[in-house]
């Protein structure tokens, strides 16, 4: 054995080493959700009758069920009190076992003290966890790995079973609501909900629906015709409005005029109609139009006598609506101006209760009260669309006896202001300067001492004469300029 020679060590092989990985994919068979449905037997239904567009089945239809969504109760529950009292024998047994219970309580207290001392000596455990008991769930027991289970686990929501329009009633039924049952604890009563119907387009809150429906019957009434003619009229009578259709206006300023529809505005329920008389395009509400046949349109627009008499009057009425309205407005404005001139204070030196002689009536008024630096009130409602009506201003310059230039408190200058557009202004407080504008003391400046509103009189102390005079409100005006000594 010792003499046997050991074989020489083999030289390391230089062959390359390679590693390979293979992956085998196993096709897993997923559970087919439709297997259970396929296995269920299919119920065949047979057709019994066909009524119009409805198919009547052999099997009776299922009665609709009231959907109820139950209300989830609150998790904070209390233990109900026991209704059955304990018998007397049990009470005696409890009294006898009080000593045993007290001894057990003492032992528990001693054990808790020992465990507390051990924890204080050992320190705080960083991995200590206290499980949280969820609301409405039962706590888990020691040694069990299961999670706390809720006492009332909600079912999986089936959204297809409850339509959107029935969701609200289903919720109310789950809360205890029933149809016809009053709501409330003290004064329970059934309150019917108010359902607002959508108004037709083009009819606002002030419009009457019945009037809009009656417009169709306002048109021209034809004498009764035979049944054959009536049927022909119904067949030839167009229905609805469209571009190029002949119509007649039933109400409004263009009532009785014929035309053709040029365009429709469905948002505002209005139509653009080209009138046959005048060839004008007007905008009319669709409720005021009635479609007519082409024959009726030609018969009312091609007769020269008819056009010359009725249509011309209608055209004049339609075209003259704006002018008549303007004339009426001007007439009303003139009446208002006349009433305003009667109501405002008239600046006349002497007033007589008796009749005025004709010579005095015919005599022109040559006394004017305009003066510089007077504080006046603008009373014309028509000037600049009433922008300066009842505005206080100061006379800057007098261009003529009855024309002046005024300046407002904001600095705006009004030129060519007539005397009848202004009214004298009386200061409210005593001690303000006023100017006498009418009478023998016209042009003099004084101080206002007192006022008598009932008699429209005021006591004015004239500076130069140093006397107190009683004047009417129409004869004085608030003065904003220098004293009367500087005016001479």
UniProtKB/Swiss-Prot annotation:
UniProt biased composition (Basic and acidic residues): 224-236, 332-341, 349-363
Species per Swiss-Prot/TrEMBL record: Mus musculus (Mouse)
Describe the subunit structure: Component of the minor spliceosome, which splices U12-type introns. Interacts with PRKX, PRKACB and DHX16.
Q: The organism sits in which domain of life? A: Eukaryota
Query: Which stretches are tagged as biased composition: Polar residues?
Result: 73-95, 307-331
Q: Which UniProt keywords apply?
A: Acetylation, mRNA processing, mRNA splicing, Nucleus, Phosphoprotein, Repeat, RNA-binding
This entry carries the following GO cellular component terms, namely: nucleoplasm; nucleus; spliceosomal complex
- Residues annotated as domain KOW: 231-258, 401-428
According to the UniProt record, which cysteines are disulfide-bonded? none
Phosphoserine modification sites are 25, 115, 485
Keyword Acetylation in record: yes
Maturation and modification: Phosphorylation regulates its ability to bind RNA.
What is the documented function of this protein?
Answer: RNA-binding protein involved in pre-mRNA splicing. As a component of the minor spliceosome, involved in the splicing of U12-type introns in pre-mRNAs.
Q: Which family does it belong to?
A: Belongs to the MOS2 family.
GO molecular function, one example? RNA binding
Where, per UniProt, does this protein localize? Nucleus
- Protein known as: G-patch domain and KOW motifs-containing protein
Q: Name one GO biological process term.
A: mRNA splicing, via spliceosome
Q: Where is the G-patch domain?
A: 164-210
Record PTM N-acetylalanine, positions in chain: 2
Show the ranges annotated as biased composition (Pro residues): 1-11
Which InterPro entries does this entry report, sorted A to Z? G_patch_dom, GPKOW_KOW1, GPKOW_KOW2, KOW, Rib_uL2_dom2, Spp2-like, Spp2/MOS2_G-patch, Translation_prot_SH3-like_sf
Q: Where is this region: Disordered?
A: 1-20, 72-97, 216-241, 295-367
